[in-house]
């Protein structure tokens, strides 16, 4: 299956189980892998034959920066639901969300989750 990929999209949001996360906010890194049939676009060179990744980015930004979820698992689920609703050609989605600086002690690059959903 063909794919459209958006990597390390950076957004500022107020999601998390800790009070500090909900009030101070933090950076969220979002990776998306969208399964889309790109056959027509690969032949036509027409934007109408694909999913516009700029519009995908804006849709995800609205959710991450405008919404508020306790769990990033729920945020990822909401991203999948919204993208399926807005972009009918998307057949499957893999979304990963990472926090680089959650309020937990320890040494790590990031913590996060990954979901895969199909229509």
Curated annotation (Swiss-Prot):
Domain of life, per lineage: Bacteria
CDD domains given in the database record: DHNA_DHNTPE (cd00534)
EC nos: 4.1.2.25
Bridged cysteine pairs (disulfide): none
Functional pathway: Cofactor biosynthesis; tetrahydrofolate biosynthesis; 2-amino-4-hydroxy-6-hydroxymethyl-7,8-dihydropteridine diphosphate from 7,8-dihydroneopterin triphosphate: step 3/4
UniProt keyword annotations, A-Z: Folate biosynthesis, Lyase
Residue numbers annotated as active site: 99
Record keyword Lyase present: yes
Reaction catalysis annotation: 7,8-dihydroneopterin = 6-hydroxymethyl-7,8-dihydropterin + glycolaldehyde
Binding site for substrate: 21, 53, 72-73
Functional note: Catalyzes the conversion of 7,8-dihydroneopterin to 6-hydroxymethyl-7,8-dihydropterin.
Family matches, as PANTHER family: DIHYDRONEOPTERIN ALDOLASE 1-RELATED (PTHR42844:SF1)
Protein name: Dihydroneopterin aldolase
Lineage: Bacteria, Bacillati, Bacillota, Bacilli, Lactobacillales
């Amino acid at each position: 299956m063909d794919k459209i990929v958006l990597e390390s999209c950076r957004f500022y949001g107020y999601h998390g189980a800790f009070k500090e996360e909900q009030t101070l906010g933090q950076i969220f890194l979002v990776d998306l892998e969208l399964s889309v049939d790109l056959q027509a676009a690969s032949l036509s060179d027409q934007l109408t034959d694909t999913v516009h990744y700029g519009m995908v980015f804006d849709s995800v930004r609205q959710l991450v920066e405008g919404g508020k979820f306790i769990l990033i698992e729920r945020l990822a689920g909401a991203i999948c639901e919204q993208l399926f609703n807005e972009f009918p050609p998307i057949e499957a989605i893999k979304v990963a969300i990472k926090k680089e600086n959650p309020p937990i002690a320890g040494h790590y690059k990031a913590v996060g989750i990954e979901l895969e959903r199909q229509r």
